Amino acid sequence: AIDLIRQSGGDAQIWKTGHSHMKKRMAEVDAPIAGEMSGHIFIADDFYGFDDALYVAIRVISQMVRTGQSITDYVDTLPIQHATPELHIACADNEKFPFIDRLAAHVKTIYDGKDLTLIDGVRVRTTDGWWLVRASNTEAALVMRAEGNCKDALDRLVKDMEAVLAAAGMNWRIECGLESAVSLS
């Protein structure tokens, strides 16, 4: 989504997950719209942080009527991305943020700063796509995701993420109860 927003002339920014973080950031940068991977979409209509699924649906339908394009036709124009499901790894509340700090310190030694975002966990961007590991704000867990521009790219990203996590002291496949042969793409 970030690449698509930027290609369309928008100023896409990565920020912390969570309703209160999003509302505050929208006000700080005067953003007309914001969204999260969870599907929450925030629209700035007379105030910041208007998060209402029915309202968003009405806005999408209104846009489709204005343009004369069906939502199916619009979705068909979007690039196909390959992504893992959101993985939650049990991690004690008092351990998850220190682990993210250790992971960030390790990742800084591997990746160039322009390929690394440390706003809400550790997000690494490569030519294949991106991967993210962050501490959950709502449960005693780490949350992991990866998205690639093709299946092979996603497989490479997952292997990269796995290697980096192992170097930081975590075999996430064991933690998640997955065997090493399991493909997440």
Task: Please give the residue ranges for each predicted region.
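Phosphate-binding and adjacent anionic-ligand microenvironments
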Residues: 1-185
